[in-house]
Amino acid sequence: MNLVLPGQVVARGAPNGEGTVKRGDYIISTRTGIFDPEKNSVTYPRKVEETAVLPNVGSIVLARVSRINARQATVNISVVDDVCTKDEFQGVIHVQDIRATEKNKVKVQNSFRPGDIVRALVISLGDGSSYFLTTARNDLGVIFAQSSETGEQMFPVDYQHMQTKSGYTEMRKCAKPILDE
């Protein structure tokens, strides 16, 4: 059994179970949890009561976007280097840290929305209240989102668009899917 993240391919060519969706031939996790290959399902991990994991510079984190404005997205970090944390930590993704290229054209509202699950890299311990994060790599960005219009789950179709099964498309800074084969 392995820890899996939302948007991660967990199996191929089998029926999907709880906490997963089928996309073509792939089974994709819809939540952070433990993958059970016998049931093709993802269950929620129990938070370890004495987890002392803290984000460090270079840590890969999973976070939920809590609010956005023109300059930054504020997130709540709940997973650090594949370990669920007991408490959430606050993080900030500044507009200049969203993409590696075309930094002057990036708009926070076209990259993230409240409720999105984001994979990010800790670049600084921040200002005492928030960790500073970046999504300026191909493997970093939104990994799970729901449409703000329809409420449906969305999947990445390219590096800057996510789409629902019904075809509705929204802009996001999408993370490249992690394919375990």
Swiss-Prot record:
Family stated for the protein in its record: Belongs to the CSL4 family.
Keywords: Cytoplasm, Exosome, Nucleus, RNA-binding, rRNA processing
Function in brief: Non-catalytic component of the RNA exosome complex which has 3'->5' exoribonuclease activity and participates in a multitude of cellular RNA processing and degradation events. In the nucleus, the RNA exosome complex is involved in proper maturation of stable RNA species such as rRNA, snRNA and snoRNA, in the elimination of RNA processing by-products and non-coding 'pervasive' transcripts, such as antisense RNA species and cryptic unstable transcripts (CUTs), and of mRNAs with processing defects, thereby limiting or excluding their export to the cytoplasm.
Ranges for domain S1 motif: 58-137
Gene3D superfamilies given in the database record: 2.40.50.100, Nucleic acid-binding proteins
Name of protein: Exosome complex component csl4
Transmembrane segments: none
Main location: nucleus
Cellular compartments annotated: Nucleus, Nucleolus; Cytoplasm
Cellular component GO terms held in the UniProt record: chromatin; cytoplasm; cytoplasmic exosome (RNase complex); cytosol; exosome (RNase complex); nuclear exosome (RNase complex); nucleolus; nucleus
Any one GO molecular-function label of the UniProt entry: RNA binding
Recorded name of the encoding gene: csl4
Subunit record text: Component of the RNA exosome complex. Specifically part of the catalytically inactive RNA exosome core complex (Exo-9) which may associate with the catalytic subunits rrp6 and dis3 in cytoplasmic- and nuclear-specific RNA exosome complex forms. Exo-9 is formed by a hexameric base ring of RNase PH domain-containing subunits and a cap ring consisting of csl4, rrp4 and rrp40.
GO biological process per UniProt: exonucleolytic trimming to generate mature 3'-end of 5.8S rRNA from tricistronic rRNA transcript (SSU-rRNA, 5.8S rRNA, LSU-rRNA); nonfunctional rRNA decay; nuclear mRNA surveillance; nuclear polyadenylation-dependent mRNA catabolic process; nuclear polyadenylation-dependent rRNA catabolic process; nuclear-transcribed mRNA catabolic process, 3'-5' exonucleolytic nonsense-mediated decay; nuclear-transcribed mRNA catabolic process, non-stop decay; TRAMP-dependent tRNA surveillance pathway
